[in-house]
């Protein structure tokens, strides 16, 4: 049995039903989405979208779409795959992503929760992570400048757009993300004799919505969150971004740090559905 955690699943923007998905693929058995299990940590540090974890999550997501429509086969599956900008800009990487998921034109055969699915991926559209917010708000910023931030688990993407065109010199990503803050907060909790919290509960602590933490500990947690956001601002400033521009923010970190982001940046908008802003934009790119 091989396991992939709920954290990895959510970061790939695929929702599960209650519990885990049992998947058989290429002679292996996987349990995807089991709460509290986070093995394969080496893959959690890999931002490329051409690895086993990402492929399994994408294939599982396709099976779930087929399941929702009472289908078991499809010979024309089209997907959009969002990548960190540094990966997206690497010569040849977009072609690698396309080839990786198209599987040489061969059909995928997968068993999920006792149901067998067969499908062929015919079209793959790579796009970079921080483009999502500006696609969703393109009418508002079609003649203006705007910055987008994607606060992900493993990396933080940023981009400046002028009349919807990305400014290459002011667009890239940092190879760190919200997972580092989660680790810091967990250490603070352990130091204060608060243990055995799930990742979901630690995220609630960061948001300030978890009830069972004392005020002294919360003061330390808030200080860590403020420092994390201030460090982000400092990095963006050092990369010459004009922080007086409107800023659109998506990603899991946007949801967790909303109050601190609004206190730190002058003109910031948290996307209405920050976890899935890039997915929503990807669907629009596919049309």
How would you name each of these model-derived features?
Residues 1, 156-160:
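Short beta-strand scaffold segments in enzyme catalytic cores
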Residues 149-153:
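Active-site-proximal alpha-helical scaffolds that flank and shape metal-associated catalytic sites
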Residues 1-148, 166-178, 200-248, 252-287:
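Nucleotide/phosphate-binding catalytic cleft detector across ATP-hydrolyzing
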Residues 195-196:
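Short, structured loop/turn "capping" segments at alpha-beta junctions
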Residues 162-164:
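Short loop/turn segments that connect beta-strands within beta-propeller blades
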Residues 189-192:
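Acidic, metal/cofactor-coordinating or nucleic-acid-engaging core segments within structured domains
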Residues 154-155, 175:
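Short, catalytically relevant binding-site loops at active-site mouths
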């Amino acid at each position: 049995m091989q396991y992939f955690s709920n954290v990895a699943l959510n970061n790939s923007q695929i929702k599960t039903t209650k519990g885990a998905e049992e998947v058989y693929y290429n002679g292996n058995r996987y349990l995807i989405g089991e709460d509290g299990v986070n093995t394969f940590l080496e893959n959690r540090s890999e931002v490329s979208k051409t690895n086993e974890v990402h492929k399994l999550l994408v294939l599982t997501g396709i099976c779930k779409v087929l399941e929702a429509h009472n289908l078991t086969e499809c010979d024309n599956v089209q997907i959009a795959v969002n990548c960190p900008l540094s990966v997206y800009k690497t010569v040849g990487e977009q072609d690698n992503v396309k080839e990786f998921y198209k599987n040489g034109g061969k059909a995928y055969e997968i068993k999920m929760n006792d149901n067998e699915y067969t499908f062929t991926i015919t079209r793959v559209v790579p796009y970079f992570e921080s483009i999502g917010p500006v696609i969703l708000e393109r009418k508002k910023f079609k003649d203006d400048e705007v910055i987008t931030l994607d606060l992900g688990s493993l990396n933080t993407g940023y981009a400046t757009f002028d009349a919807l065109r990305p400014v290459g010199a002011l667009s890239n990503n940092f190879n760190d993300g919200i997972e580092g803050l989660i680790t810091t907060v967990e250490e603070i909790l352990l130091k204060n004799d608060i243990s055995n919290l799930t990742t979901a509960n630690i995220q609630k602590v960061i948001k300030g919505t978890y009830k069972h933490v004392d005020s002294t500990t919360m003061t330390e947690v808030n200080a860590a969150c403020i420092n994390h956001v201030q460090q982000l601002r400092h990095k963006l400033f050092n990369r010459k971004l004009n922080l007086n521009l409107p800023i659109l923010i998506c990603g899991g970190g946007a949801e967790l740090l909303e109050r601190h982001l609004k206190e730190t940046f002058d003109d910031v908008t948290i996307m209405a559905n920050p976890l899935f802003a890039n997915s929503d934009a990807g669907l629009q790119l596919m049309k």
